[in-house]
Amino acid sequence: MSGPGSKLSIFLLICIVSLSLSSCKKQKNDVIPDVTVDFYIDLTDPEFFDLNAIGNHVLVNYNTNNLGYKASGYDNNGIIVYRSQTDEFIALDRTCPHDYVLDGTSIAVNVDGVYAECPLCKSTYALPSFGTPTSGPSKYPLKMYRTSFTGQFVHVTNY
């Protein structure tokens, strides 16, 4: 017998299957290969003092405050950590996705204020909008890493 309860069950089953299948797919725009990223930033450390103000950023790499290879990003180009709101941080790989897709070149973007620019292809990426390209040939955003904030510490990871 088919009643309202069985139609709802079928609908819920379809929704669950669709969600589980879509969550397994790699993001189409994530063209930079995965590397291990896992580090903490202490906002009381003078090296990261700029992150105490909304709209500021810091560049993190292997040598930053002895964070090591887990703060290197792809091909040791480093990671941009940007404070977008009081309790929200955005972490982006500095590798230009356009140059990587084109020929496998690994070029670190330069950061000035709220924009990052590739010195090779001249694509510009907006930090407040999660590294979305705003000009130039790039069709891909900068690779983004997960962040969490606990009041004093910002955790950046791809786990």
Predicted segments — roles?
Residues 1-3, 53, 129:
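Intrinsically disordered, low-complexity segments enriched in small/polar residues
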Residues 1-8, 13-44:
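Bacterial Sec-dependent N-terminal signal peptides
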Residues 6-8, 71, 76, 116, ...:
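Polar low-complexity intrinsically disordered regions enriched in Ser/Thr and small residues
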Residues 11-13, 84-85, 119, 135:
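Generic detector of short alpha-helix boundary/capping microenvironments
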Residues 22, 94, 116-119:
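Extracellular secreted precursors and ectodomains with disulfide-bonded cysteine-rich loops/domains
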Residues 27-111, 126-127, 143-159:
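N-terminal pre-ligand scaffold of iron-sulfur
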Residues 110-121, 132-145:
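Short cysteine/histidine-rich metal-coordination sites, predominantly Zn2+-binding motifs
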